[in-house]
Each structure stands twice: as C-alpha cells, then as structure tokens.
Amino acid sequence: MFAVIKAGGKQYKVDRNSVIKIEKIDGELGSKVQFDQILMIGEYSKPSFIGTPIVKGAIVTAEITNQLKDNKIIAFKKKRRKNYRRKAGHRQELTELKILDITKQ
C-alpha cells in the first residue's frame, strides 16, 4: 500500500517501512507523528483513492528516526568589473521519518 502525503508544502510518495527526509518538524527521536493530509492512497494492484483535495479518514503514522541538516547551499551573486560580490550559505534542517502504517477508515 502507498500514499501521497503533504508535509512542509511538498508532496511525498511513501510506502510502509520506507524512510523519507522532510523539512524539520519538532519532536523527540522515537516519537510518533501522524499525517492527516493524504492526497492519494492506494495499492499497486487495485484502483487508488484520489482526494478532493484530501482523502477523508486516511492517516499515515511515522516514527522520527533522526534530526539532521542537509548539505550547504551556496547563493552567490556578483557584478562584473565593479568589485561587487555577495555570498550566502544555507543548511536546511531535516527530519528523517520511517513510515509505520497507512490506514483508511
């Protein structure tokens, strides 16, 4: 069974026991998180339920396995011949989740 969830303004396709990295959400390591904004749910051999915009009664349960930072992104701009250079860096904080269960009532 798979589902498409909405988290942090992005969409992720998840299966049971899959591991995903999403934008940081608060929580302790090992704590459970439930997602109720499910855009689509289905099985590979049967037709899927597509939400309008979300599937009512569908819940995805996940466990927080790690809190980490992504690789550094460099933003650089310059103007030629003017000695104008600006450099900025950013490291996005991420949360790693293990999907435990996908249910639809």
Curated annotation (Swiss-Prot):
This is Large ribosomal subunit protein bL21. Belongs to the bacterial ribosomal protein bL21 family. GO terms for molecular function: rRNA binding; structural constituent of ribosome. GO terms for biological process: translation. Coiled coil: none annotated. Keywords: Ribonucleoprotein, Ribosomal protein, RNA-binding, rRNA-binding. Part of the 50S ribosomal subunit. Contacts protein L20. It comes from Rickettsia typhi (strain ATCC VR-144 / Wilmington). GO terms for cellular component: cytoplasm; ribonucleoprotein complex; ribosome. HAMAP family: Ribosomal_bL21. It comes from the Bacteria. InterPro entries: bL21-like (IPR028909), bL21-like_sf (IPR036164), Ribosomal_bL21 (IPR001787), Ribosomal_bL21_CS (IPR018258). This protein binds to 23S rRNA in the presence of protein L20.
